Amino acid sequence: GPVTEDVGLKKVLANLKSEWRVLVDMSYFQGFTHEEISKILNIPLGTVKTRIRSALSQLRTMIQP
């Protein structure tokens, strides 16, 4: 069920670079917008978007069998 998938996702997240992991966690698990993340972490909005996009594409390759 969903719980197992969530645990699996957390395991996969653990393999991401730490700066990507923080952004994915804030964006998807804590519900912050990209703009909020940019302000909180004091990094440019473009950087937030680029890192999240990179992280998600890497996650996809890890998740695919």
Segments from the language model and where they lie:
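The N-cap/first-turn positions of alpha helices
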Residues: 19-20
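DNA-recognition helix of helix-turn-helix
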Residues: 41-65
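Short, locally clustered residues in the helix-turn-helix/winged-helix DNA-binding domain
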Residues: 13-14, 28, 60
